[in-house]
Amino acid sequence: MMEQIMLFGLYLTPLFNAIAKVESDCGVTSKNIYQISDIYIDDLNRIYPHIYPKLIKFDKVASEYAMYDYWRFYAYQYARKTGKPITYEVLARIHNGGPNGMFKATTLPHWHKVEKELKKELERAKQ
């Protein structure tokens, strides 16, 4: 796992763990821990040509690097367009709903589940 990796001032490990719990119960109920689709990977390869093979979605650490790059690109675009800060909510909703996920009402229920798990992860990190 990418320990203590930060993006936009946010520690990502608690968010990765929260998303994994919500998306797949940490891999228990899914072959793909973060539910990364081929479309997600195709989009990454459009931004960063031919870096990510489709099989990365089956590898936890490679998936985290892919998510990092996805967020690095699209969360920055969000902040630039809106002038608003990048938060865990922004990252989770972009991951769930694509480049414009933060603007989609359909990503709110997912965010609320992630937020609940994220609070647990952040509390655990304090101990």
Predicted stretch roles:
Residues 43, 47-103, 114-121:
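Alpha-helical segment that forms one wall of the substrate-binding/catalytic cleft
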Residues 1-14, 120-127:
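N-terminal secretory targeting signals
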Residues 37, 111-114:
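Glycine-rich, phosphate-binding/catalytic loops in enzymes
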Residues 25-46:
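N-terminal targeting signals for Sec/Tat export/insertion, comprising classic cleavable signal peptides
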Residues 28, 103-104:
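Short catalytic/ligand-binding loop motif for oxyanion handling, primarily in non-cytosolic enzymes
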Residues 11-27, 36, 67, 89-99:
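Short, functionally critical alpha-helical segments immediately adjacent to catalytic or ligand/cofactor-binding
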Residues 105-109:
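A short acidic/glycine-rich loop-to-helix N-cap element
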